[in-house]
Amino acid sequence: MAHIEKQAGELQEKLIAVNRVSKTVKGGRIFSFTALTVVGDGNGRVGFGYGKAREVPAAIQKAMEKARRNMINVALNHGTLQHPVKGTHTGSRVFMQPASEGTGIIAGGAMRAVLEVAGVRNVLAKAYGSTNPINVVRATIDGLENMKSPDMVAAKRGKSVEEILGK
């Protein structure tokens, strides 16, 4: 797992996986490479990209570009999640729940990379079903997208934040 920093708005970029894939043609096999990357600002913005090319650096570059284009905003609560969330994509299911300060990121492989670049500092997370990195990343992003802050819920219901939080 490589960690590459760029100056483009101080985005953190992480390479999750590089695979060699092949296409069988009449004359044999044509090999190409795929790269899965995540990009985030460490403050609630995160995106992932999947690139494919004949050479590894080109695949990584394509993936990074796609990740920068497909960023979402995540409403964080002091470096952790707002509430427990579940995310799914095909055969992968992920469960993430907020954790107290000092816990750290307790998550596996691909999920850890997404949470780190998103700016989550304390979380308990578990992946169920398929652990294919692409599906786990998509499921994690799905879970983070579905997370609602108390402000969002209050606005949707037409109530005050105190009423939502039960204070």
UniProtKB/Swiss-Prot annotation:
Gene: rpsE
Quaternary structure note: Part of the 30S ribosomal subunit. Contacts proteins S4 and S8.
UniProt superkingdom: Bacteria
Matches recorded under SUPFAM superfamilies: dsRNA-binding domain-like, Ribosomal protein S5 domain 2-like
GO annotation terms (biological process): translation
One cellular component term from this protein's GO annotations in UniProt: small ribosomal subunit
Name of this protein: Small ribosomal subunit protein uS5
InterPro entries: Ribosomal_Su5_D2-typ_SF (IPR020568), Ribosomal_uS5 (IPR000851), Ribosomal_uS5_bac-type (IPR005712), Ribosomal_uS5_C (IPR005324), Ribosomal_uS5_N (IPR013810), Ribosomal_uS5_N_CS (IPR018192), Ribsml_uS5_D2-typ_fold_subgr (IPR014721)
Keyword Ribonucleoprotein: yes
Listed PANTHER family: MITOCHONDRIAL RIBOSOMAL PROTEIN S5
Record PROSITE patterns: RIBOSOMAL_S5, S5_DSRBD
Keywords: Ribonucleoprotein, Ribosomal protein, RNA-binding, rRNA-binding
Pfam families linked to this entry: Ribosomal_S5, Ribosomal_S5_C
Claim: Iron-sulfur is one of the keywords in the record: no
Role this protein plays: With S4 and S12 plays an important role in translational accuracy. Located at the back of the 30S subunit body where it stabilizes the conformation of the head with respect to the body.
S5 DRBM domain boundaries: 11-74
An example Gene Ontology molecular-function term: structural constituent of ribosome
Domains as described in the record: The N-terminal domain interacts with the head of the 30S subunit; the C-terminal domain interacts with the body and contacts protein S4. The interaction surface between S4 and S5 is involved in control of translational fidelity.
Family according to the record: Belongs to the universal ribosomal protein uS5 family.
Gene3D superfamilies to which the protein is assigned, alphabetical: 3.30.160.20, 3.30.230.10
